Amino acid sequence: MGLEKSLMLFPLLVLVLGLVQPSLGRESSAMKFERQHMDSAGTGSSPTYCNQMMMRREMTNGSCKPVNTFVHEPLAHVHAACSQKNVTCKNGKGNCYKSSSALHITDCRLKGNSKYPNCDYQTSNYQKRIIVACEGNPYVPVHLDASV
């Protein structure tokens, strides 16, 4: 009888695991934001910083991401932007917010003659405010919309 129950429950277990498993390895939007944009410990001062970081953060897999910005501030400072004055995002959505102060950032721009797999980036450092799109509960950055 115990074996019969186990055999009856097995298909149900397979169904549940099939539904749950794909989401286990999926990167959340907030985690992707951190991977692509946060480097609290870095300074971005090396001319090869962007080449190294874009590769390390998996933004040169299959193609070269044309533009990316790294923020060199504590994550809490970036999260704080989500409680600032609301601004319209570039895509017209209303979930963007501008940081209250300028932050240390590094812009990485793909050089014109650069082609995959040899992605070559120009590294530029700035002190600028950032505009981030925020979502979720807790309300956290999920997209870096601009630096101004």
From Swiss-Prot:
Disulfide bonds join 50-108, 64-119, 82-134, 89-96. Substrate binds at residues 32, 35, 65-69, 90, 109. It catalyses: an [RNA] containing cytidine + H2O = an [RNA]-3'-cytidine-3'-phosphate + a 5'-hydroxy-ribonucleotide-3'-[RNA]; an [RNA] containing uridine + H2O = an [RNA]-3'-uridine-3'-phosphate + a 5'-hydroxy-ribonucleotide-3'-[RNA]. Pfam families: RnaseA (PF00074). The keyword Hydrolase applies. One of its GO terms (cellular component) is extracellular region. Its EC number is 4.6.1.18. Pancreas. One of its GO terms (molecular function) is lyase activity. GO terms for biological process: defense response to Gram-positive bacterium. InterPro entries: RNaseA, RNaseA-like_dom_sf, RNaseA_AS, RNaseA_domain. It is found in: Secreted. The active site is at 37 (proton acceptor), 143 (proton donor). Keywords: Disulfide bond, Endonuclease, Hydrolase, Lyase, Nuclease, Secreted, Signal. It is an enzyme of class 4 (lyase). CDD domains: RNase_A_canonical. Residues 1-25 form the signal peptide. The keyword DNA damage does not apply. Monomer. Interacts with and forms tight 1:1 complexes with RNH1. Dimerization of two such complexes may occur. Interaction with RNH1 inhibits this protein. Belongs to the pancreatic ribonuclease family. Endonuclease that catalyzes the cleavage of RNA on the 3' side of pyrimidine nucleotides. Acts on single-stranded and double-stranded RNA. This is Ribonuclease pancreatic. It comes from Gerbilliscus gambianus.
